[in-house]
Amino acid sequence: CFRRSCYITKPTLSRLEMGPIWDFDLAFGNMYMDNPKYDDWATIGSMDSSSYIGVTWFNYLMTDEDFRNKARTRWNDVRNTMVNAALGTIDAYKPMVIPSAEENFEIWNTLGVANGFQPLTMKNYNTYLDQVLYLRKFINNRAKWIDENL
């Protein structure tokens, strides 16, 4: 989200604000060029701009110990709420989305296929429920990795 679909605003006489988060098309391991793994900082490219992500302001923020300490504190404050909300949202919407997902996959024949910039591992998920399980596992693994690496 720090390369695209992320905005910073500056209200008059106020601090910088992040948001709104725009979309999640590149989130949760869905784009191989942004590093589909849960165990890395996908927003940090090579400092010589040779990577797809390139040099961004986030590269520099993550080298600032004060920023990392504040980020760690904030993560610890919101982690469980965020993870539970994400997993709860998936569970809540899954029954409602299943009919549309089945129709979508029938029309577009995209199950078991890595489309566009998706990682090749998407070929392993041959049902909608497989993809839901992938998403849930990714979220849990990502949260655990952040716990250990922030």
Model regions: which residues?
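Middle-to-C-terminal accessory/interaction subdomains
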Residues: 1-150
